[in-house]
Amino acid sequence: MPAVPVVAPRAIDLATLQAIADLPSEPRYNSQRNLGRDLMLLSFALGGINYADLYALPYDAYKVDYIEYKRQKTQHARADEALYRVYICEEVRPLLTRYLDPTRKRLFIFHRRFPAGNFPTKVSCAVKAVEKAVPFERHYTYYSARHTYATLAYNVANIDKYTVHELLNHSDKEMKITDRYIERDWQRLYDAHKRIVALINWSSICEG
């Protein structure tokens, strides 16, 4: 059996995440730091969503109480096409509303501001601006929001590891058959997600 690759730690701690949320908005419309802050927090608020999915979400993914989408990275490896729902917590609605696409061509406006091919670079530069303002003991990136979501879920919110696995919408070969028999309890996942999102105070970001 091939060895499982070791992934270097990418999570930041709760205090650093809160400091990012508390970063005051810069007055410039095209502020890299504002964008990076909001992208990190959007990812955390939406269960560690990756930027490819965030960019491509269709408007009809928005179901008022939750966002429903198929995770691009694993949709072709699973019978359910990696279908997932992430609950929209009330405290983060102002942040989501800030980026909704008024044309409704997609859920968020990123496709109108950045060509698809440039978006990864824009995300990287934006998060670097955040990192400069809020340093941590090791380098972090956009994907640190996903790692932080999982780490805080398990270590701080005391959510069991399998529920964290479900919240991340991971594909597990060992559980593939079993998962076909189990109907998802979305309310259980929503409740767990709420506990994670509630770990930080969103008032500063939602006022900004």
Segments the model singles out, each with a brief description of its role:
Residues 26-30, 72-87, 110-118, 136-144, ...:
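Short, contiguous acidic/charged loop-to-helix segments that flank catalytic cores in large enzymes
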Residues 60-68, 137-138, 159-180, 202-208:
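Short, polar N-cap/turn motifs at the start of nucleic acid-interacting alpha helices
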